[in-house]
UniProtKB/Swiss-Prot annotation:
Required co-factors: pyridoxal 5'-phosphate
Recorded name of the encoding gene: hemL
Entry's Gene Ontology molecular function annotations: glutamate-1-semialdehyde 2,1-aminomutase activity; pyridoxal phosphate binding; transaminase activity
One GO cellular component term: cytoplasm
Subcellular location: Cytoplasm
Coiled-coil region list: none
N6-(pyridoxal phosphate)lysine sites (modified residues): K265
Protein's name according to its UniProt entry: Glutamate-1-semialdehyde 2,1-aminomutase
Source organism: Hyperthermus butylicus (strain DSM 5456 / JCM 9403 / PLM1-5)
C-alpha cells in the first residue's frame, strides 16, 4: 500500500493539480496514490520501497512490459540525433509503412499525439467526407476527452445524446446519437430515422473502458453492413485493441473491416501517439491534400516513431503475443475458479491479453451490465492485491492487462496472491 513518501508527495500534488493528479483514474488508488520511482519488465518500484507486479501497464500501451531493451535502444539512438525537428524524416515513413501492412493496406496514415486527437480527427474527417453532421456512438464506450464523444444516453425516450461532462453545450451533444453496445436493434432504430444524416458509427470493437466487454458474435459485422447500407463510415476505435489482440488488431481478430481506424497506446511504444488510418480516397480529404483540417507541432514525434517501430518489430516475432495471451488466459481461469470456490457471483470477461472481473449475477455483455456490479467488492479486491504487491486497475471499468513480461513464473506468483486476496474478501 502507498506509504509515507507517497503521502507527502500527494499532499504537495493536491496544491498543484486538480484532485492531485493529471488524469482522474490515477486518484482512484486509496487512500492516496502510490508514486513511482522506476519500472522494468512486469514490475513497478515505488518511492516507498515497494515492488508491485503491474497489470495496469499504463492502461494499455506497454504490451512488451516496462522498459523493453529494444525499445529503449531505439529511443536512445533517436535522442542522439535530436528529438524534435518540425520537418519530415525517414522514421515516420517507416512506421507508417509498418502500420499499413496490417491496417488499410495501400491506404494512408496521419500521426497525431493522443487517442483523443485520433478519434476527434476521425470524426471530423468522416463529416468532411460525407457532408453529414450526426455520429452514432455506444453508451458506455469511451473515445477520448472531446466534446463529440463525452456523450451518453438520455432517457429511454430520448433520441439524442446528453453531455457526460460540464462544459459541453447540449447543442453539441445532440449531434451524437447514442446506441447500446452489443444491441443491433438499437442501431437499426437510430439509422432507420437518421441514417441519411449520419456521417459515422464509431465503436470500440472490444469495450475496453467499461471493463472488458467483447462483441457478441456478428455484432461488428452487422455494424459494417448497416453503415454501408446507409452510406455512413464505420470508425473502429482500436486505441486499446490495435496491435494487442493481433498485429491487425480487432479487425484481424474478428474479421471485419472499418472505413477509418484509430490507433494509439501500443503503436507509440509507451510514448504519446494517436493514429488515423484509412483508404487513400478518405485520407486525401485531410489537409494539406484536402479541406479537413488537422495539424500539430508534435505530430509524428521522432522519439515516438522510434519507440513505435521498435515495438512492432518485436511483436512481429510472435512470442510476445503468445506469452501475453497465455498470461491472460491463466489469470482468467484462476479468477473463474476462485469465484466458483467461494460461491461469489461474478463474471470474468477475457479476450487474449485483456481481462476483467465483474462482481455481478449473470453475464456482462454491455456497459449497462457492468454498471450493476458490486464496485465496493472490486475495490476491496484491488486494495487486498495492492497490499500483497499486485497492481490491478482501481476501477473495474478499466481492463486488467497482461504483457510479454508476464512470464509463467510471474503469473504463478500472481495466482498465489490472488488466492490470498480472495480469502480476505470473505
Amino acid at each position: 500500500m502507498p506509504g509515507e513518501v507517497s503521502r507527502s508527495l500527494y499532499e504537495k500534488a493536491l496544491t498543484l493539480f486538480p484532485g492531485g493528479v493529471n488524469s482522474p483514474v490515477r486518484a482512484a488508488v486509496k487512500p492516496y496514490p502510490f508514486y513511482v520511482e522506476r519500472a522494468e519488465g512486469p514490475y513497478i518500484y515505488t518511492v516507498d520501497g515497494e515492488k508491485l507486479i503491474d497489470y495496469v501497464l499504463a492502461y494499455g500501451p506497454l504490451i512488451l512490459g516496462h522498459k523493453h531493451p529494444r525499445v529503449e535502444e531505439a529511443v536512445r539512438r533517436q535522442l542522439e540525433k535530436g528529438w524534435l525537428y518540425g520537418a519530415p524524416y525517414e522514421l515516420e515513413i517507416r512506421l507508417a509503412e509498418k502500420i499499413l501492412k496490417y491496417y488499410h493496406p495501400g491506404g494512408m496514415v496521419r500521426f497525431v499525439n493522443t487517442g483523443t486527437e485520433a478519434t476527434m480527427t476521425a470524426i471530423r474527417l468522416a463529416r468532411g467526407v460525407t457532408g453529414r453532421k450526426y455520429i452514432v456512438k455506444f453508451n458506455g464506450c469511451y473515445h477520448g476527452a472531446h466534446d463529440a464523444v463525452l456523450v451518453g444516453a438520455g432517457s429511454a425516450a430520448a433520441e439524442y445524446g446528453v453531455p457526460t461532462s460540464k462544459g459541453i453545450p447540449e447543442e453539441v451533444a445532440k449531434l451524437t446519437l447514442v446506441a447500446k453496445y452489443n444491441d443491433i436493434e438499437s442501431v437499426e432504430k437510430i439509422m432507420s430515422k437518421h441514417g441519411d444524416e449520419v456521417a459515422a458509427i464509431i465503436v470500440e470493437p472490444v469495450a475496453g473502458n467499461a471493463g472488458v466487454i467483447p462483441p457478441k458474435k456478428g455484432f461488428l459485422q452487422e455494424l459494417r453492413r448497416i453503415a454501408s447500407e446507409h452510406g455512413a463510415l464505420l470508425i473502429m476505435d482500436e486505441v486499446i485493441t490495435g496491435f494487442r489482440l493481433a498485429l491487425g488488431g480487432a479487425q484481424e481478430y474478428y474479421r471485419v473491416k472499418a472505413d477509418i481506424t484509430t490507433l494509439g497506446k501500443i503503436v507509440g511504444g509507451g510514448f504519446p501517439i494517436g493514429v488515423v488510418v484509412a483508404d487513400r480516397k478518405i485520407m486525401e480529404h485531410l489537409t494539406p491534400s484536402g479541406k479537413v483540417f488537422n495539424a500539430g507541432t508534435f505530430n509524428a514525434h521522432p522519439v515516438t516513431m522510434a519507440a513505435g517501430l521498435a515495438t512492432i518489430e518485436v511483436l512481429e516475432e510472435g512470442t510476445p503475443y503468445r506469452v501475453a495471451s497465455e498470461a491472460g488466459r491463466a489469470l482468467a481461469e484462476e479468477l473463474e475458479s476462485l469465484v466458483l470456490s467461494y460461491g461469489i457471483d461474478a463474471a470474468v470477461n477475457h479476450v487474449e491479453s485483456m481481462l476483467q472481473i465483474f462482481f455481478v449475477k449473470g453475464e456482462v455483455w454491455s456497459p449497462e451490465d457492468a454498471a450493476k456490479s458490486d464496485k465496493k467488492l472490486y475495490l476491496k479486491l484491488h486494495e487486498e492485491l495492492l497490499k500483497l504487491g499486485v497492481f490491478i486497475a482501481p476501477s473495474q471499468m478499466e481492463a486488467i492487462f497482461t504483457s510479454a513480461a508476464h512470464t509463467s513464473d510471474v503469473v504463478s506468483e500472481t495466482i498465489e496472491k490472488l488466492r490470498k486476496a480472495f480469502k480476505r474478501l470473505r
